[in-house]
């Protein structure tokens, strides 16, 4: 490349050398010339990393499916000879009481029962369940079961003609959890035991004699389901040594080191003589763990052995849709569901580690036999735990930090029981979860509003819609308000970590606000503003041992002392910058957060790495942080001296890091000067940050 500055220097240099030789002794001391040019700062770029595959199962607190009731009237037009089950039949449950999926239960409670007064049959109530495993029955975080009402035959008419006839019970099977696990055992095998329930499709003349009495036409006019199951052990006096419990039971083993799950779904048969078969296994489970979720397949184990053989039960087809999750602070319990590939059977289930005795000690063979010695035991005691996810919300007004629920999906924010997708629909339906920006480009941050489906219209809340489910219908309130969430999320180059700003807004119509009907514009009330961060932690075995690893990114911050400063994440030159150097070998992390259009670091962070996370402190410079640079006479400053920082590493190989802190000095800051000059304010800060691992530009 032709550089005029270089050419000019080449012309001048010979003349200069010649004059040096001619005048003053003819010597030229090269040692007096500084030939070392300043070295430019190294240039970096993001490392490439594996993008997460789009998740077929978006997770949730639980799922329910309603019994089918076929129109069996022979002259019906169109005829309804068969109703198959579908993935679209799954409905998400709300958060809260694990035995009460309120939306679904309210639907059935509102039905008029047989003879006008049939009560709700509920497996969670005493003496109404059919399944139980002794020592694994005291569920605290997950419940699975059924509830239904006996409904008399109903007829629909048009004019004087019958158009439809239906009969049989109406209800749901479900599993529902609370407190999705943030930590799980690092290694070892853990045994879970519990129960399962099912319902079937409906088809003309279909019957399953292995399941019980067929006189009311289960499987034909209404779904055969576990609530009417017969020929099973349903009390202790019927239980033999060869039985593994009452009714329908599950046995699941989880290998947390290998991230695998295997299990059996069993029916405990009532036996009349010693030659009878005590148990029948209908399914084997095989799944892979990802954070606090798992997915895989269920294989039918009692299929017809040849084309000529038939089975008198519906469990004859495999399923490729097994999914579920762990609940409880230490992964003590789990719930799952699947639909058979022939769309004939839907299954839900739950299982738990061994119950604790009432005195709180570990049951024999339970926690003490946990993964430390390789034997199957319970995850809740005596086994090392690892953090599998972070999900936190930091409120700006009171500087509080609270945990959010999350289903090991950084791209789904769960607040107030509502699931908010953080990526545009285009990226969710694609091959991976890369953040597709506007106009085909990539937006570093994304801003959008989210109104839960249950608030937009009177829909059946909790029903999965196009893979974008609302976790519950709790967003609206009884006063007709509609809650809208205003979200800004960062960053497009982060796949396993998302952080940003969240604003809750309540809207109500002018009529609801007491205005005249001519002022029909919605009135919006800002309820509260906060920051959030959530990420899928790196497996501790995959944490590298490298030294001087550079991470770069951005941050959101709100800093106050009388007056305040706020800054948002940005990839613009001179925007909010986050720079970190990580020494995995010595387990140290050092970094700076620099505010928009500032040269000096706003915060200096130092910390120690433990496992797949880190903790440390953040502080401003001794001279403080200028809150308002436009104030030339008296710049208000904030002094942060010892903010406690928490964070983690995210992605398959720790390609991403992030963290957070909220600081509120409850005493007057010694060196602080507030905007009013009275010296009575205290400094505070709320910060979330994220960064991507870097490599030198080649």
Curated annotation (Swiss-Prot):
Location of this chain's protein in the cell: Cell outer membrane; Cell surface
Ranges of biased composition (kind: Polar residues): 46-56, 460-476
Biased composition (Low complexity): 369-383, 671-686
Matches recorded under InterPro entries: OMP/PagP_b-brl (IPR011250), TbpB_B_D (IPR001677), TbpB_C-lobe (IPR035316), TbpB_C-lobe_sf (IPR038197), TbpB_N-lobe (IPR035313), TbpB_N-lobe_sf (IPR038669)
Region called Disordered, residue ranges: 33-58, 83-102, 294-324, 349-383, 428-479, 669-698
Primary role: Neisseria acquires iron by extracting it from serum transferrin (TF) in its human host. Acts as a TF receptor and is required for TF utilization. Involved in the initial capture of TF. Helps select only those TF molecules that can be used as an iron source and concentrates them on the cell surface, maintaining the iron-loaded status of the TF C-terminal lobe until its delivery to TbpA.
Record's protein name: Transferrin-binding protein B
Organism: Neisseria meningitidis serogroup A / serotype 4A (strain DSM 15465 / Z2491)
Originating gene: tbpB
């Amino acid at each position: 490349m032709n550089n005029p500055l270089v050419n000019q220097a080449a012309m001048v240099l010979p003349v200069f050398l010649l004059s040096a030789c001619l005048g003053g002794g003819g010597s030229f001391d090269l040692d007096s010339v500084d030939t070392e040019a300043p070295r430019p700062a190294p240039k970096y770029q993001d490392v490439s990393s594996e993008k997460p595959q789009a998740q077929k199962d978006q997770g949730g607190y639980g799922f329910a499916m309603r019994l089918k009731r076929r129109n069996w009237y022979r002259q019906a037009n169109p005829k309804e000879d068969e109703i198959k089950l579908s993935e679209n039949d799954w409905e998400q449950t709300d958060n809260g009481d694990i035995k009460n999926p309120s939306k679904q239960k309210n639907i059935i409670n509102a039905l008029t029962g047989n003879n006008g007064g049939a009560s709700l049959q509920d497996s969670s109530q005493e003496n109404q369940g059919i399944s139980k495993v002794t020592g694994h029955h005291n569920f605290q975080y997950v419940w699975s079961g059924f509830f239904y009402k006996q409904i008399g035959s109903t007829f629909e008419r048009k004019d004087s003609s019958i158009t439809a006839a239906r009969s049989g019970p109406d209800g749901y099977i479900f599993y529902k959890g609370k407190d999705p696990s943030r930590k799980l055992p690092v290694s070892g095998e853990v045994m879970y035991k519990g129960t399962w329930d099912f319902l079937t499709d409906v088809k003309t003349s279909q019957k399953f004699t292995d399941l019980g009495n067929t006189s009311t036409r289960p499987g034909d006019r209404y779904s055969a389901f576990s609530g009417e199951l017969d020929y099973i052990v349903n009390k202790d006096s019927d239980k033999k040594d060869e039985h593994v419990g009452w009714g329908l039971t599950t046995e699941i083993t989880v290998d947390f080191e290998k991230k695998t799950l295997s299990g059996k779904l069993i029916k405990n048969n009532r036996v009349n003589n010693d030659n009878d078969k005590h148990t029948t296994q209908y399914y084997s489970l095989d799944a892979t763990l990802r954070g606090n979720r798992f997915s895989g397949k269920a294989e039918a184990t009692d299929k017809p052995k040849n084309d000529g053989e038939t089975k008198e039960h519906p469990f004859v087809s495999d399923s490729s849709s097994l999914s579920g999750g762990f609940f409880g602070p230490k992964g003590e319990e789990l719930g799952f569901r699947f639909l058979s590939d022939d769309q004939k059977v839907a299954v839900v289930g739950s299982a738990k580690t061994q119950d604790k005795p009432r005195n709180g000690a570990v049951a024999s063979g339970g926690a003490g036999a946990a993964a430390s010695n390789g034997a199957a035991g319970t995850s809740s005691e005596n086994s090392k735990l690892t953090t599998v996810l972070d999900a936190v919300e930091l409120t700006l007004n009171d500087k509080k930090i609270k945990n959010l629920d999350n289903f090991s999906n950084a791209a789904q924010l769960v607040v107030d029981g509502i699931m908010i997708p953080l990526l545009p629909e285009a990226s969710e339906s694609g091959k991976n979860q890369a953040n597709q920006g506007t106009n085909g480009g990539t937006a570093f941050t994304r801003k959008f509003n989210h109104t839960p489906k249950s608030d937009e219209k009177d829909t059946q809340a909790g029903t999965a819609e196009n893979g974008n489910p609302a976790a519950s219908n709790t967003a609206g309130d009884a006063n007709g308000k509609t809650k809208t969430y205003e979200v800004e999320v960062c960053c497009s180059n982060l796949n396993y970590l998302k952080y940003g700003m969240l604003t809750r807004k309540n809207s109500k119509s002018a009529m609801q606000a007491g205005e005249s009907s001519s002022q029909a514009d919605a009135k919006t009330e800002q309820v509260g503003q906060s920051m959030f961060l959530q990420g899928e932690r790196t497996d501790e075995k995959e944490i590298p041992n490298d030294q001087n690893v550079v991470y770069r990114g951005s941050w959101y911050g709100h800093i106050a002392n009388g007056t305040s400063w706020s800054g948002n994440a940005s990839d613009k030159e001179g925007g909010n910058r986050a720079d970190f150097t990580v020494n995995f070998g010595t387990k140290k992390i050092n970094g700076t957060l620099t505010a928009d259009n500032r040269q000096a670091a706003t915060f200096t962070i130092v910390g120690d790495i433990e496992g797949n996370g880190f903790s440390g402190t953040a502080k401003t410079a001794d001279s403080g942080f200028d809150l308002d640079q436009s104030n030339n006479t008296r710049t208000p400053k904030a002094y942060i001296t010892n903010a406690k920082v928490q964070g983690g590493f995210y992605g398959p190989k720790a390609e991403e890091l992030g963290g957070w802190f909220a600081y509120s000095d409850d005493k007057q800051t010694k060196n602080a000067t507030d905007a009013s000059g009275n010296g009575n304010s205290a400094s505070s800060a709320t910060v979330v940050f994220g960064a991507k691992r870097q490599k030198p530009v080649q």
